[in-house]
Curated annotation (Swiss-Prot):
Function field: Interferes with one step of hemostasis (modulation of platelet aggregation, or coagulation cascade, for example).
Domain C-type lectin: 34-145
Family annotation (Pfam families): Lectin_C (PF00059)
Protein name (record): Snaclec B1
Assembly and oligomerization: Heterodimer; disulfide-linked.
Amino acid sequence: MGRIIFVSFGLLVVFLSLSGTGAALNCASGWSGYDQHCYKVFDKPKSWADAEKFCKKQTSGGHLVSFHSSEETDFVVELVSQTLESQILWMGLSKVWNQCDWGWSNGAKLKYKAWAEESYCVYFSSTKKGWRSRACRLLGHFVCKSPA
């Protein structure tokens, strides 16, 4: 009887230790799992567009991280704090000004365009609360997210 309890306890410890690594969600090696998704922090800074392309190449369905709850945000911030000291991490939110549906105040359609190349993308901080925007061309670390 004592052996069964010991073995059961051992299996429970192994299961609990693997549940936070992504192993329970079939995440690739080096990726961490949370709520049916896999996450990985990358420490080589890239522009927003290059980071998004990179995430798409890493795994099927991969993108820059998106947040859908405060619990998910807390999970990713904790994951980042174990890997980086960076305060600027790209996330998959952007506003590309020259792709919006614009119109003139007099009702005329916008036909002539002279947009500057600057677009703004959103980053989050591993040490400060809230999201901020900055030029997409600037470099930042990033977190990729994919379905488990």
